[in-house]
Amino acid sequence: MENMGLKIFGDVFRQKRILITGNTGFKGSWLSLWLHDLGAEVTGLALAPDTEPSHFDLIGLKDIVNHIECDIRDSRVVNKAFKTADPEIVFHLAAQALVRDSYENPKDTFDTNIGGTVNILEAVRASSSVNAAVVVTSDKCYENREWIWGYRENDPMGGHDPYSASKGATEIVCSAYRRSFFNKTGLGPHVGFSTVRA
């Protein structure tokens, strides 16, 4: 049965080379499957799944996308993966995403979420093929005010715990890259670039 919801995208992603970091995670595996179904050539870059069974394994993603197992903290492996995939579009979802783990291993959280993102952004900057990049962070990037309404784009960055602080810092890093490198007047090639909170 054809998924009618995907029809609205037409051929936008057909035959596009797309690199997705964190494709073994829940959101990344769904995004990989969805883009594959839209005709994209998907390359995933991620650690091995950390649950058994994993969504990645249950949907057979390793059989339908190119998967490169790597830690985004290793810039050499990230750069090699970018050269292999030659992506036109990058979705960066890889992260240490657990607040509790951030208390137990704050350095790993900061190294992955900030340093790993810098490695991805540097690979985008060095690439001649990337036209667009999206970095996925979290609503935890905002200062926690405990109010009744949702956060807004112009709310201050913050974070009382290492995970939240790492996501706020990632937003600031992305803003610096957007302004310095990924615009028509910056020092690098024009790349359509955005962050989203999911």
Kindly label every feature range from the protein language model.
Residues M1-R197:
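N-terminal Rossmann-like NAD(P)+-binding domain of SDR-like oxidoreductases, especially those catalyzing
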